[in-house]
Amino acid sequence: LLAFTGHKALLGPTGTGGLVVGERAVIAPWREGGTGGDSSSPVQPSEFPHRLEGGTPNVFGIAGLREGAKILLERGVESILSHEREMLAVFYRALKDPARYSWYGADHVIAGQCGEGRVGLVGINLPGFAPAEMAAILDERFDIAVRAGLHCAPYAHKHLGTFPQGTVRLSVGLLTTAEEMSEAAGAFDEVAASVPSDASSGS
């Protein structure tokens, strides 16, 4: 079994996803009701995928997911990943003093632009600011959207030593521009300028 979400890297709408079921897997619905396809039957049909898809399908969401997948196939996953890594490098190079921040992941990998093992996001904190506070400032003062907190991965943050507050997650994508990343770096630096340098030594 392989479950996936559609609204992240696949560029689909929220509320989309899927479950890939291997031929050897034997699974059955844990609760049954109206199937939408054969309302006279009290149980789900035996054929797939209808056996696992009760009710009215999310047609608009699936159509959007299909278009997202088409874009990925047309642009190429490696090409998109290369662009995302370059955008992170632009952000890193645009910061006045990257060492003032706490980085999670290999910041030298970003600076070197090789990006080996990194996807289009980075966890970053500014000592002196809780991640949620930093995210609120970026939103309210600079109209920059980031994600703060544990990112649905509390055990990963326990491993990183960032539990329970988490990190500020900066995510980039296919449509992210170098200008946007430079503006984001300027916003981070403006917030950092309000913190005494001795209280803002990154790790």
Where are these regions (language model features)?
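Pyridoxal 5′-phosphate
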Residues: L1-S203
